[in-house]
């Protein structure tokens, strides 16, 4: 009797293998065959799930964006600034837990990635801007803070990410507290 394959699990295994190879070799230098070898399957098996490298990259980031959405969904209750602090910690934790995804993101940033990177940024900016508006409404923010500061907060997180990726002496996870402190206390009334 032929071995039954859990298609969803196999798909995730292939995506995980693709992210590892993309992070190690770069997206442009990666071939489908490289992903197959990393996943321990035949090249043709990859094509049963994904028709191209772009589809692999898109699938990997769809999975990552789902996890990112969970961070936003799990902010809980409390003041808007408490939730902003949890958002910073959660986002940095996610990036620290998935450094290969972060490496691939940096690799494809300047290129024209096959997924909607702008949509991911809009979602995060919108979530942060909502928290800033709520904090402003509750009298928690000093004057002059507005939705533009959402992009600055994202920039602070990404700046730390870049440093952690290029310098092994920098621990991204250890920067969560300082980033949250600067981003939240720097805008608090």
Predicted features and spans:
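Base-recognition residues in the alpha-helical recognition helix of bacterial helix-turn-helix
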Residues: 23, 47-51, 59-63
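Amphipathic alpha-helical segments used for helix-helix packing
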Residues: 94-115
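C-terminal peripheral helix-coil segments that are non-catalytic and often amphipathic
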Residues: 1, 86, 93-97, 125-137, ...
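Key DNA-contact positions within bacterial/archaeal DNA-binding proteins
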Residues: 44
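Hydrophobic alpha-helical connector segments
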Residues: 59, 73-100, 149-153, 176
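Basic, helix-initiating cap at the start of DNA-binding domains
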Residues: 1-25, 29-41, 54-55
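Amphipathic alpha-helical packing segments from all-alpha helical-bundle domains
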Residues: 66-69, 114-140, 147-151, 177
